[in-house]
Amino acid sequence: MEYISVTKENLEKEHICCAISNNKDVQVSSKKAWLADRFDEGLVFLKSAERGKCFIEYIPAESAWVPIDADGYMYIDCLWVSGSFKGHGYSTDLLNACMEDSREKGRKGLCILVAAKKKPFLADPKFLKYKGFTVCDEADNGIQLWHLSFDEEADKPQFKECAKHPHIDEKGYVLYYTSQCPFNAKYVPVLEKTAKENDIPFRAIHIESREEAQSAPTPITNYALFHDGEYVTNEQMNDKKFLKLVNR
């Protein structure tokens, strides 16, 4: 398998795996705009040269859009291999490339968000355990922070206090999200429209800076839905799934 690094120089012409469309599509344009601002912060986007979902995205943890204390580590935003790409060892290829790059850059190790049982849009815990990752922290909602240290003496990553007990003081449905995932550009407006049409209390909070993300009241900032203050899910929804959730 041939792999390509997406950079500022080739961002315009390369597809971004999870949203394969032209650059005018709102999902593609929002993701590419977010990526363009991250490259100078050290973000790496490595993908299959073939079209499809086969890529890894990672960034120095100090610049990660999640509320963690993991100075010196590399944070994996997303590792996604699916469809016809599964079962060929490509996840291992991508992870190994990340490990090699992180070692060369003097990082202490890797860290990533996981759940004890596989959840949508989170990495497979069985795969990570097989690769040597272990749990280093866990929030009340079951979202875990896993790590693979290159140095046994290195401090372990941990969640910031604001993320350990996900809760907000607001009634109704409240969604925190970023532009890291391209699907949000399409489906967040769908939820806003659906909620309005069905008189469902709903507010979407677009996290637009690293500082906002690192102080968010949830370990997952990419997509975190709350109801009456309590965390509900990180699974992105269309109108039908949302209405089913609220029993409408």
Which stretches of residues belong to each language-model region?
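Conserved GNAT acetyl-CoA-binding A-motif
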Residues: 102-120
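Conserved acetyl-CoA-binding loop-helix of GNAT-fold acetyltransferases
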Residues: 81, 87-102
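Conserved beta-strand in the GNAT
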Residues: 51-63, 75, 80
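Conserved catalytic-core motifs of GNAT/GCN5-like acyltransferases
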Residues: 113, 132-147, 232-235
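C-terminal "cap" of GNAT-fold acetyltransferases
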Residues: 141-165
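A conserved beta-turn-beta hairpin within the catalytic core of GNAT-like acetyltransferases
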Residues: 64-76, 86
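Short amphipathic alpha-helix that is part of the acyltransferase structural core
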Residues: 1-51, 161-163, 171, 182-183, ...
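Non-catalytic, surface beta->alpha helical segment in thiol-disulfide oxidoreductase systems
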Residues: 228-248
